[in-house]
């Protein structure tokens, strides 16, 4: 099993690769993720059912169990959310401000990927997918 430092290093290395992906590749990957979620719906619901049972058996409070539970509508929203992210403008490389200095040097302020986005959360399978989609679109790796 990998330790947390090793996982973080792998995320950082992946961040380099994601930061140079072109918009078309990112959008194709997002649509492929949405399709794979749809194609694996039954398996995802089966695993989620096991997670919910384990949560209840371990005394997790009902509010967290509810957040953990995938419903048909939550699943549809999750898949459609990935497709929606694919339709958004690519934030990478967007120029927000710029000017030419007296010496002729052009100075611009533009958006670039962070590299790795770390997120701490619990009991929300849809958040996993949302974060992954947003990080992919913005050229970042994620560490969940």
Name each model-derived stretch.
Residues 87, 91-144:
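Conserved small-residue-rich beta-alpha loop and adjacent elements
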Residues 1-105, 134:
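N-terminal Rossmann-like NAD(P)+-binding subdomain of aldehyde/semialdehyde dehydrogenases
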